[in-house]
Amino acid sequence: MLQARVQLKRGFVKATTTGVPGGEDVKKGPDTFKRSALLALGALGIVYGDIGTSPLYALRECFTGAHGIPPTPANVLGVLSLIFWSLIIVVSVKYLLLVMKADNRGEGGILAMMALVMQRQRAQPSHRSRPMLITLGIFGAALLYGDGIITPAITVLSAVEGLHVATAVFDPYVIPIALVILVALFLVQRHGTADIGAVFGPVMCIWFLTLAGLGVKELVHNPAVLGALSPWHAVELFRHNHLHGFLVLGGVFLVVTGCEALYADMGHFGRKPIQLAWFSMVLPALMLNYLGQGALLLRDASAARNPFFLLAPSWLLYPLVALATVAGVIASQALIAGVFSLTRQAMQLGYSPRMEVVHTSAEEMGQIYLPGLNWALLVGVVALVLGFRSSSALASAYGIAVSTAMVITTLMAYVVARELWGVRRWVAIPVVGLFLSVELAFFGANAVKVADGGWFPLLMAVVVFTLMTTWKRGRDILAAKLRASSIPLKVLLGSFGDHPPVRVPGTAIFMTGNAEGTPPALLHNLKHNKVLHEQVVLLTILSEELPHVPHSERVEVEPLEQGFVRVVARYGFMENPGIPDVLKRCREKGLQFQLMGTSFFLGRETLIPTKRPGMAVWREALFAWMSRNARSATAYFRIPPNRVVELGAQVEL
């Protein structure tokens, strides 16, 4: 049975889950609701930052964006109806009630879902849908990198633009102020958020209460706007506006752009606390604010230029800009952390080269910082702000990547429902068809934005997809080449009977990706040094398609003959493998050695691109470049550098 406990560490509230998928998120007991409430508060600061800051710009873009429609009363009610039903169908039903059930041992996100499906199909490697699902999953993950760059830019910029409403004096300083905030945000990533993360939830709670209060203030003056909850107004909008009514969906879509991040962050808090936060606070606050903005537009159509900030009285504008900026920073922080986590998953699943991973908290293993990726994101965000120069222009670039990722998630959820849950086709197809009809409409409306900026996230997704697939394919080709040039371990051990090598004291650990063959580094050592240590450990570290591997299953130790020992260590895609941990588990299994008398032998391949079958020459050259720039195995696995011997070899791809 899945169990969860609440951990309170330095102000953090965290759900820790163990067991099988599909169980309860919170351990049953008299204080269940209290635990759920604490976790829900934490979810406000991490999970709902992106979708919670959409009121800053979403409704405005429906009327003033590149494909906006006039803010007539009928159009206002129609857009509000579309917003309400989008939040219900896409967020509430699809993600909160259905997709979040597709967890991989408590973890969510498109790569976690792909790994979940791959587990099921591992026994059927010839399954026809397997290559397609892998391609969809990797491309969906690549799309989210564009979201990770655009979200910080648009949320912070739209918040600072609230100064336009207060006074024109700040107009020349909006972009510099936004850039200062964004640069500071990325500079503090190296220090982590352990000390300030505890306030994220309460601050976002204040933000959502403010959203609700601003909306209610205007609603009491024009309660007729509540009629927009009827889907009839959405139908009327399409009937009267025709193509323009369809294109306005590109603006409506901005209210649901945080869904993929919401699903990816599920592992932090569990499904039920996230649902509790949505239905008890986030959804009511969002709808009250959108309805309040709509009521303002019914009273004054000119307010369409910035309906969110015009909801506030003049004396509240500066505090509201400050609060919106803080909320935007929190939303951006969640997206940046999500990109770090996604990249770690890609590394563990074999779709990304090794990068430097810094743990910013001694207590929470999930809080990580990737320096190289952090600076790449900063460059991308600054370039977006300087290139687009306004949140309205950025809105044109927003949407196409996320809408495509949503379609991919729906298709993969169908596979999960059919193959893992056993849902009958006649039940699954209509449900998936409903979601696809909505999401494909959003995709079509966003597709027209490609020329206006939508090309940026698509280009970025193609680049990331190319890098990820090239790395995976290159590693597979390299592994096949090394296996072909290797010899079975039994053959090597058998040859020692006639020509035994000289044995020297100590332990040698040879790291190898092939748990059955002889490590190339071992053969090179024998060839050049003509000696073997008294104890030889063949160590293979495997990444499983699970988020976490139980400690009891972490390490397998298999004694072989002539002083050889085979060790297989398994890690999940949410874990960081490390030699200190492996050695500790080996000692617990009875494998004895002295670290200062142990040498680690690693192979280091120099890759030579060729015109042989496998990959195009340009992809082989790209793979060789990625391999040269990947973090060394010594640093990545935290091997004592003064105990490492690297043996090189040239490999023609």
Swiss-Prot record:
The chain crosses the membrane at residues 37-57, 79-99, 134-154, 168-188, 196-216, 243-263, 278-298, 320-340, 368-388, 397-417, 426-446, 450-470. Belongs to the HAK/KUP transporter (TC 2.A.72) family. The lineage of its organism: Bacteria, Pseudomonadati, Myxococcota, Myxococcia, Myxococcales. Keywords: Cell inner membrane, Cell membrane, Ion transport, Membrane, Potassium, Potassium transport, Symport, Transmembrane, Transmembrane helix, Transport. It is found in: Cell inner membrane. The gene is kup. One of its GO terms (molecular function) is potassium ion transmembrane transporter activity. It comes from the Bacteria. Disulfide bonds: none annotated. This is Probable potassium transport system protein Kup. InterPro entries: K+_transporter (IPR003855), K_trans_C (IPR053952), K_trans_N (IPR053951), Kup (IPR023051). It catalyses: K(+)(in) + H(+)(in) = K(+)(out) + H(+)(out). It comes from Myxococcus xanthus (strain DK1622). HAMAP family: Kup. Transport of potassium into the cell. Likely operates as a K(+):H(+) symporter. Pfam families: K_trans, K_trans_C. It is a multi-pass membrane protein. One of its GO terms (cellular component) is plasma membrane.
